[in-house]
Amino acid sequence: MKIFRDILTNAEVVXDNDKPMDVLDEIVYAXQGRYIE
């Protein structure tokens, strides 16, 4: 799993397969991410 930080809301989004689970209109607003177990 990977945590992305939303550059618009500054919220952390947990994702699988390097993609956030919640994608709006297939646009991903994520800057830096880090891996978690």
UniProtKB/Swiss-Prot annotation:
Residues 1-37 form the TCTP domain. Pfam families: TCTP. InterPro entries: Mss4-like_sf (IPR011057), TCTP (IPR034737), Translational_control_tumour_p (IPR018105). One of its GO terms (cellular component) is cytoplasm. Keywords: Calcium, Cytoplasm. It is found in: Cytoplasm. Signal peptide: none annotated. Belongs to the TCTP family. Binds calcium; exact function not known. Monomer. This is Translationally-controlled tumor protein homolog. It comes from Trypanosoma brucei brucei.
